[in-house]
A protein has these predicted regions:
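Short, surface-exposed loop/strand segments
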Residues: 1, 6, 38
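Short, flexible coil/linker elements and helix-boundary hinge sites characteristic
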Residues: 5-7, 19, 130
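Membrane-inserting effector segments that mediate pore formation, membrane fusion
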Residues: 9-69
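Short acidic/histidine-centered micro-motifs embedded in hydrophobic/aromatic stretches
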Residues: 48, 54-57, 73-76, 91, ...
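Membrane-proximal, non-transmembrane interface segments of integral membrane proteins
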Residues: 63-132
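Long, helix-rich, hydrophobic modules that act as membrane-proximal anchors or helical bundle/coiled-coil regulators
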Residues: 102-178
């Protein structure tokens, strides 16, 4: 792994586990996300400072998208304690047999719609609260990556006997229905 990748992963882990970021992240709810990204308000959060720095140098659109997803992710988990997040990362590391923060960063990066970040946060919340196992968390992360955001809204229809041409195939291939 290159040094820049290590710094990105390490800064993500520090940002995730650091309770001091809560005050900065609280501004997300009060201000428009795009204004925060452009203004550099959250550069004090290590991962966000790194991503914003890379974006300023490269003007890479993907980096801006990752920054936006990262803000939403950290904000969505800001009410959890450092200990809860440490325990989660440890369990996630063991389950993946790879550094948990690196795998989680890859999951966030692969998510194609920023609205799916709240779904990821809810899954992590369910895992931390003991409502799902770490194995199910890993599996459901794969579903988030594969399923188009628009089809998440259709899932509730499938709680009863329901079928919709086109949607059935996507949900089935994503492993959500059978």
């Amino acid at each position: 792994m290159e040094e820049s990748e290590i710094n990105l992963v390490d800064s993500f882990e520090v940002s995730l586990l650091n309770d001091d970021s809560k005050d900065l992240l609280a501004t997300v709810g009060d201000t428009g996300l795009d204004a925060i990204i452009t203004g550099g308000t959250l550069d004090g959060v290590p991962i966000l400072g790194v991503l914003n720095g890379i974006f300023k140098v490269t003007k890479n659109y993907q980096m801006r998208r990752l920054y936006k997803k990262m803000v939403l992710f950290l904000y969505g988990l800001s009410d959890f304690s450092q200990r809860d997040k440490e325990n989660f990362l440890h369990e996630y590391t063991v389950a993946n047999q790879e550094k948990g923060s690196e795998v989680l960063l890859a999951v966030i990066d692969k998510i194609d719609n920023a609205n799916k970040i709240s779904i990821l946060c809810n899954l992590m919340r369910a895992k931390i609260n003991g409502e799902i196992s770490i194995d199910n968390f890993v599996r459901l992360c794969q579903v988030i990556e594969r399923l188009p955001y628009v089809d998440f809204k259709n899932l509730v229809k499938y709680m009863v006997d329901y079928s919709e041409l086109g949607t059935d195939d996507v949900l089935s291939s994503s492993g959500v229905i059978y």
